[in-house]
UniProtKB/Swiss-Prot annotation:
Species this chain originates from: Legionella pneumophila
EC number: 2.7.7.108, 2.7.7.n6
Keywords recorded for this protein, A-Z: ATP-binding, Guanine-nucleotide releasing factor, Host cytoplasmic vesicle, Host membrane, Lipid-binding, Membrane, Multifunctional enzyme, Nucleotide-binding, Nucleotidyltransferase, Secreted, Transferase, Virulence
Gene: drrA
Protein adenylyltransferase/guanylyltransferase as annotated region, ranges: 1-339
Stated name of the protein: Multifunctional virulence effector protein DrrA
């Protein structure tokens, strides 16, 4: 039986005899077959000799071996098709995988390869040829420990088919190790001068959702960090392959995927090719590139030496001899941690972008501004630039409706600045205006939906008043949450302006002059604005009877057990917000009646001093509330007079 099973061949017995037969069936070769067999052995021996005699050559021994073996194996393929009388399909591709694809193979590494054909009918035609080639490689391995065709690994007799066939084998789990096989295919390198089918197969793997995490940059980095860890303390020996080469391999795979490094000849798949592209594109600091390159070359030199010494794959070496390389690999793993962190930061930034874009699509202006501000703050905190995030958004779109809002916001930038200028820096983060405008410009740069022009939706009108209300609602949302009094001052001021604009809209009196009047209005000092002379964010003065929510369960949770003047200030601020909703005398009376029926009003009416309680005097906070009501009533009357005058 052959490695993959007995095969039937139409070999010209006089010319090649048993060259392609299973050596267990026919251990002896005919003279003609023996001559051809020795020819292949001599080519391998000469290649080994060239490598040893060319020390100091610019090309490394492992690169020299991979280049030379590719030529020998290519010749073996052509010879086998000729000998078996099979016409080679013109589109057939053979790909090296594993160490051969990555230019890491030594004289004693396995021969990992697979075959891709264009049509299903070609599979039956070419499979017997690669069965025969496997028999030949097995015979060579028996003689010299070289080019072993692993029967359960990436084997050209087992892994053969169209791109759809091979992809189906992966998806259906019909290979020994799906993840390892997928990675081997993704890092494979063509033996013959054709690669289009390989690209098609790689694209299928990358685009398959169930494989996306398996072949992502983050996955590769984590394998370097978590799967191929440093040897245990006290270990006497280490594996050059497992403890040094594998972490570097997966780091380079992660870098190739993250930066989308590619070259048509497949050179990017080797460590030297990846390192060259990293350096050419200036993608990492030179110190980090040089470290990877240095450790890789040291490890490969040692691996080549060990394999030659033992005349087989042998990767173990004393821990003490490997210590310096292991220390450098630890630093390379640290780079992996940095890259994973950066990827996760970009993933989170992308989610924040999606949230902001969703708000645009809904026409929620204040929601968009808040989400865009969160994105800006996150990117600033994580030291991310717009150009870092832009590639992550290549498949994202902004609708014409969203674009219309962005344009209107951009046009209202100066008005936005005036609205924010009425507040102190304690309520609005410095640079907030420029930050959000900057993010709006960034959003406007993103492409629109397919086939849509970069113009706003002409049927979606965004009035200036709507934009300004959205801006002021946003300013309310970003008021400093750690300072309740300042937050309420901001809320009250913005509510006042929002209510004023809404009244202008109801009276059909929106124009640049009236909007400017609203924008330019400023709030009085906090104590005057809240009409409560003891306004404070602390519990306030010492009292015989401190106001609390103890007997008012309905409001206890809302005010988080605040006490004293701070509690009354908080309640007054909320009442101020509610009064701002009144549009006429009737609605004002209804709101006042509603507020007086609440537990909060009873807290305002409860005296904190002994005299106030004994004599049942009106508290200063109730007086403040009454003053608020009168101010609101006067504001309504003033607005009504202005409306009549304009009409």
């Amino acid at each position: 039986m052959s490695i993959m099973g007995r095969i039937k061949m139409s070999v010209n017995e006089e010319q090649f005899g048993s060259l392609y037969s299973d050596e267990r069936d026919k251990p002896l070769l005919s003279p003609t077959a023996q001559k051809k067999f020795e020819e292949y052995q001599n080519k391998l021996a000469n290649l080994s000799k060239i490598i040893r005699e060319n020390e100091g050559n610019e090309v490394s021994p492992w690169q020299e071996w991979e280049n030379g073996l590719r030529q020998i194996y290519k010749e073996m393929i052509y010879d086998a098709f000729d000998a078996l009388g099979v016409e080679m399909p013109k589109d057939m591709e053979v790909h090296f995988a594993g160490s051969l694809a990555k230019a890491q193979a030594t004289e004693y590494s396995d021969l990992d390869a697979f075959v891709i054909v264009k049509n299903d009918e070609d599979i039956k035609k070419v499979k017997p040829v690669f069965d025969a080639l496997n028999n030949l490689c097995q015979r060579i391995f028996t003689a010299s420990n070289q080019i072993y065709p692993d029967p359960i690994g990436i084997n050209p007799s087992r892994l053969i088919g169209t791109p759809d066939d091979l992809f189906g084998m992966l998806k259906d789990g019909m290979v020994a190790d799906v993840e390892a096989t997928a990675m081997s295919i993704l890092t494979s390198k063509p033996v013959l001068p054709r690669y289009e089918l390989g690209e098609e197969l790689r694209d299928k793997i990358k685009q398959e959702p169930s494989f996306s995490n398996m072949v992502s940059a983050k996955k590769f980095y984590n394998k370097a960090i978590k799967d191929f860890t440093a040897p245990k303390e006290g270990a006497e020996v280490v594996s050059v392959k497992t403890h040094i080469m594998r972490p570097i391999d997966f780091m380079l795979m992660g870098l190739r995927e993250e930066f989308n490094l590619y070259s048509e000849d497949g050179a990017h798949l080797s460590a030297p090719g990846t390192i060259r592209l990293l350096r050419e594109k200036n993608l990492l600091p030179e110190e980090q590139i040089a470290r990877i390159e240095s450790v890789y070359n040291q490890a490969m030199s040692k691996r080549f030496e060990l394999h030659a010494e033992h005349k087989k794959e042998h990767d173990e070496m004393p821990y003490s001899d490997a210590k310096a390389m292991l220390d450098e690999v630890a630093k390379i793993r640290e780079l992996g941690v940095q890259r994973v962190t950066r990827i996760e930061n970009l993933e989170n930034a992308k989610k924040l972008w999606d949230n902001a874009n969703s708000m645009l699509e809904k026409g929620n202006i204040s929601g968009y501004l808040k989400a865009a501000n969160e994105l800006h703050k996150f990117m600033k905190e994580k030291n991310l630039k717009e150009d870092d995030l832009r590639p992550e958004l290549s498949d994202k779109t902004i609708s014409p409706k969203g674009y219309a809002i962005l344009q209107s916001l951009w046009g209202a930038a100066s008005d936005y600045s005036r609205a924010a200028a009425t507040l102190t820096e304690s309520t609005v983060e410095p640079g907030l205006v420029s930050a959000v405008n900057k993010m709006s410009a960034f959003f406007m740069d993103c492409k629109l939906s397919p086939n849509e022009r970069a113009t706003p939706d002409p049927d979606f009108k965004v009035g200036k008043s709507k934009i300004l209300v959205g801006i002021m609602q946003f300013i309310k949302d970003v008021a400093d949450p750690t300072s309740k009094i300042w937050m309420h001052n901001t809320k009250a001021l913005m509510n006042h302006k929002i209510a004023a604009i809404q009244k202008l809209e109801r009276s059909n009196n929106v124009n640049d002059e009236t909007l400017e009047s609203v924008l330019s209005s400023k709030g009085e000092n906090l104590s005057e604005y809240l009409s409560y002379k003891y306004a404070t964010k602390d519990e306030g003065r010492e009292h015989r009877y401190t106001a609390s929510t103890e007997n008012f369960k309905n409001v206890k949770e809302k005010y988080q057990q605040m006490r004293g003047d701070a509690l009354k200030t908080e309640i007054l601020a909320d009442f101020k917000d509610k009064l701002a909703e009144a549009t006429d005398e009737q609605s004002l009376k209804q709101i006042v009646a509603e507020l007086k029926s609440k537990d909060e009003y009873r807290i305002l009416a409860k005296g904190q001093g002994l005299t106030t309680q004994l004599l049942g005097l009106k508290t200063s906070s109730v007086s403040s509330f009454e003053k608020m009501v009168e101010e609101t009533r006067e504001s309504i009357k003033s607005q009504e007079r202005q409306t009549i005058k304009i009409k």
